[in-house]
Amino acid sequence: ANVPNTTDKREYKKLLVNIKNNMQKDIQQQYSQPHKPVFITYQTGAQYMRDTLSISMAQLEAANECDDIICAGPIYPMTDRGGHLDGNGYRWFGEMLGKVYYQSQVQGKPFRPLQPTAIARETLPTQIRIKYHVPVRPLVFDTYLIPKIKDYGFEVYLRDYRQENKQIIKQVEIDGDDVVLTCEQPLVGDVIVVYAGTRSFIEDRPKGKDGLQGHGNLRDSDPYKAFFKYEDLDEVQKDGTFIHPRDSFETRLRPDY
């Protein structure tokens, strides 16, 4: 009760830094260690996105502004059930955190996730160019791990983030470390670019189950290989019963896609 919460980006970032400082202080006092432990966070995403993506932006900005915070990246590529990661998703998430910790704290190499660094208008009035920090080239649209999201997860709006101001995107293409968006109409006035937002959906399933809001297909080419393999949560035994338990009304645990 009476715990502060917010969806405002600045306020959330301040609260995130506060809890980071409090946790580090507690650990240093409890274990008498001189150094602050690193604080690794993910980016809120998938079904938990809200409008202007203020929370995920606050998490990324905090990591970029504080030397002792590392953003490991989003978790939307990982399998979930109703927004909560399933066994495979949590295992994958754990490996992502382990990779980031090992690279940054054991190998001593800095880690920054794939992220935009600049957005600029092109000569053509219908085009926008988004420049990225790409940890491992090349930049890729991946439709293997996630079904193809409409426009690979990108959305463009004029003036404000309202459905009626959403622009029709004719083409999305990768150009080196950049993504170039070509819209149907000239982009005049304030332009808002959204990636993996609340209105994203599987391209061939705009109104179907598991539309995958908060998802996109853009990734880098990190060569890291997982230690563990995906487990079929719907595998059955010889007697026809499921290996992994479930409620009586559930016929499958795998994501619908």
Annotate the PLM regions.
Residues 1-257:
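Cell-envelope and extracellular/periplasmic
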